[in-house]
Structure formats: C-alpha cells, structure tokens
Amino acid sequence: MSRIILLITLFIFGCASQKPIKPNQVVNFDVPEQWEVNISQNLDFDQKWWNIFNDDNLNSFMVEFIDENISLEKAMLNTRKAKQASVIATGSLLPSISISSGVVESEQNTAGIPTVFSALLGQSSDEVTVFTQENYNLSLGTQWEIDLWGKLRQGRIATKQQYLSAKYFEDFLKLSLTAEASKLYFAIIEAEQVLNNASKKLKNAETIFELYSLRYNKGSISIQAYQQSKIIFNATKSDYNNKLLMVNSLKREARLLVKDYPSTEFLVNNNFPKKLPSIPNTLPADIVKRRPDLIAQQYNLLANKALDRQALLTLFPTFSLSGSYGSSSNDLEDLTNEDFSVWNRGLNVFMPVFNAGKLIANKRLAKSNREIAMLDFVNALLTAYKEIESGFESDLTSNKALEIINENIALSENIYN
C-alpha cells in the first residue's frame, strides 16, 4: 500500500504545476525522457486524490488533517508573510505622502535678561515678565527615493520570487504531508491486522501452555517440556504487547497530526481497499520538471539572484526627493491664510564612504546565499529523480514478490488439499 501511495504522490507532484523547468541547464548529465511502467490502468488525479480509495474513514481523516494540521497552517501563514513582504517592497518604489499637524505652547520669562535688553523692553531690571506663546502648524510632506540604479526594483523582484517560492512550497507540503498521512492511515490498518494475528497466536500459545501445565501436574511430561511451553507463551505474550504498543503509537501520531489529544481512539477500516489505483503506463520525465518543490526551489534561486544584484547596487549613491507644504501660525484661525504658508523642497544625495566593510560583507553574503540556493535547487532536482527511480524499482520488486507469494499459496493449497 505504501508503494502505491508513493507512486501516486510522485505522479500528482508532477501534475501540480504547469511551469516546467529545464534540468539540463543546471546539471551536466542526461536525464531520462520517460519511464516505462507495466501498469494497465490509467487514472486522473485531483487534489483530493485519496477519494480513489473509497474509504469514508480515510476521507474524514484527510479532511480534518488539511483543516487542522499545524505544519500546513504554518506554511499558509508563511505564504501570507511573503505576500505582504512583496507588497511592502513594491510600495518602496512609490513616493510616500504624509500629513502632519501639531500645536506647541511655550512660556518664557525675562529673568536673567541683561539690563540693556530690559530697558529696551520698557521694564525695570528688577521686574520679571512672563511671555506665553502658542504655535499651530499643518503640513503635507512627501519623500521619494529615485530608483536610479534599480536597487528597489531588485528588492521587489526578490520579494515576489520569495512569495512564489513560499506558495509552491505550501503546495508541495500539502501534497507531501497528505501522502504521509494516508500512508499512516494504512499503516494503522496493517498494524491492527498484525495485532489480530498476534492475538490469535497468543490465544493458541495460552491454550498449549495450559495443556502442558495440566500434563505436567499429572506427571505426563518432563519439567523441561513444561518450561519450554512457558517460554513460548511468554515470548508470544511479549510479542503481542509490542504489536499493541505499535498500534497505539501509530494512532497517537494520527491524532497529533490533526491537532488533537494523542489518544488511541482512531477509526480505520478493518481491511485494505479491494480496488487499488494505478498510474499511467508511461510517465514522461517532464512531470519531474513541474514538481512544486522544484518550482519553489527555482523561485528561491531567482530571489537570491535578485538579492545579490541588490547588494551590489547598495554601493552606489542614493538620490531622494523631499518636499512639504503647509502653514504655521500663532493663531489657529490663520492656518488657512496664505500669508502664513510655508514650504520646502530638496534633493538629498547619500553616498556611502566608510562603513567598516559592512556593504562589501553584505555583497559577499548575498553571493554565498545565491550559490547555496543553486546547490539546494540541484539537490532537490537529483532527489526528485532518485525518488522516482527508487519508487519504480520498489514497485517492480513488490510485484515480483507478490507473484512469488501467490505461487507459494497455490503450492501450499495443493500440498494440504
């Protein structure tokens, strides 16, 4: 069952995106054009591919898994964060406009003013006068960094690629984790069947041990035979307990995946599906190029390339325009009077001269991140090919093993019948 889910997942991964990449541009060896698979049935898959198993318990579990799984929720939030970062970077290309207003009240006295100034004010040197003043202001200001070298545009490109990378990684994680969740579901079915067989073995071992105990008490068998039967019974009991522990562990893991208390209450069918799905006879290698995890790595590589270029452009001068228009008056009623209007405009130039090597280090860091992104992309590409090659080999091996088992069953029936 696990190999069926693996092959289905590989097929869905390839059909999840329609934006192919070109592996030959990043690897220097030939890749297969297609894989031949000896399976007769062709099926179309959608995002809810687990419905093809016709298992109501599985369907309920998968729906709850998609709604409640913590990893999927975190991936969705990371995609939202990346989208907002892209919005912020796009906004940096446009002028910023703001409105400011204020009122200031100040008080000043003539204490400590030289005598000559006191005389000018028409007061004696011993007299202290208090002045109170209010000022009202209202202004509209703007600032705009001129993206002369394209530094801000590279930042916008990088954040957009990061958003797309996060989006495709979310798609990949959804496909990958749903495949793992369905494998866990069928692993529980298998574990319960193994536990059921272990329970029957334990019951048989207990019956044999009771029979040997009865014969030993009557003196019909030796103590060695009695002890050997007890050893077999204890070993069978220990094996049953281990199988029970395995079932409970798998059920707790399933409950944990849906953000629920890890109890052992989990419903599954008693048997595997009678009709198993298949994949097409021939799979084109092009489906690997459309895997969402590879698309995510590709966008991550493009984002790091843009950040590398942006780090280089930070070494260039920065130009920005600023200006404001408003009014300032000691009387609130005069704020709308044109005689009290104030304005300013200017061009600011910032040229980095000395920063202890921070900009150079930032450029080298961006270059290293770009090289790491390239290695991650190549590794993801090779891993994708490895998974498909291993999956097909496992499928062929399992089919041969199934043929051998069926042959052994037929031989056993001929012997005992």
Please report, for each region that a protein language model flagged, where it lies by residue.
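Sec-dependent signal peptide recognition
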Residues: M1-I8
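Small/polar-residue-enriched beta-strand and adjacent coil segments characteristic
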Residues: M76, K83, S92-F172, T282, ...
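C-terminal motif of bacterial Sec signal peptides marking the signal peptidase cleavage site
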Residues: I12-G14
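Short, solvent-exposed, mixed-charge loop/turn linkers that connect secondary-structure elements
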Residues: K203, S222, N241-V288
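Transmembrane beta-barrel architecture of outer-membrane proteins
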Residues: L58-S60, N135-N137, K183, Q228, ...
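Amphipathic alpha-helical coiled-coil segments
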Residues: K74-A89, L173, L177-K200, T207-L214, ...
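Bacterial Sec-pathway N-terminal export signals of envelope proteins
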Residues: A16-I88, F272-L302, V353, L381, ...
